[in-house]
């Protein structure tokens, strides 16, 4: 399960419907061009929290059909609706996903006992492995190392997608849980996270920048910090340009420039303007 995973983008048509042909093209691009080790399906990058249960299921089906046996597949099934999370956990386990993942329950200020109940309910409903999806800056849920330890007492909870800039907590967790998987979740911080011993990374920009992500990861693991830092500098220049132009819209526009039918974003995300399209063309030419 270690390595470089793209947080899978989803192609939508102008009316917000899933563009199945485009989604398959994105998956193929990730596998054939970006050379990723796996796909993290149904996360923030997939605009998951704006989708119906049936739409989520269809995306899980397409990803499995297109990528089965070629790369590892992790299904993000988390939801504030626990019944939906359990339903999706069962659905993706039956499809054959290598692991499931679940974002910490958000919006309502759940206490830790409620969060623990949420995870135990999901993982105890299936014969599978679970990776916690920790992204405090969006969920408002900041778990302590003691709370992670309590969750990790369940052997079926095998790791965490750590999308935070708290490198002290990351170091403490790596030391405390040597047998648990830790995936870095911030693409722009991949080098320091790798130095601290993460087992891999899950990133949105890997949909276009997966090759550089692997270069950073492998160079840092070998102790070649100079090379890793050089590639991280280029990567962060790219990320800065993407963020300044609109994250998901720009990644999709870059893919369009590379011949992939990446489609539109789901409303209420805005449609790319002519200025955004022109800038994305410049970004693609500059970095790829």
UniProtKB/Swiss-Prot annotation:
pH-dependent activity: Optimum pH is 7.6.
Positions annotated as active site in the UniProt record: 133 (proton donor), 161 (schiff-base intermediate with substrate)
Lineage of the species this protein comes from: Bacteria, Bacillati, Bacillota, Clostridia, Eubacteriales
GO CC annotations, alphabetized: cytosol
Protein name as catalogued: N-acetylneuraminate lyase
Record organism: Clostridium perfringens (strain 13 / Type A)
Keyword Magnesium: no
Localization terms from the record: Cytoplasm
Gene: nanA
Coiled-coil parts of chain: none
EC number: 4.1.3.3
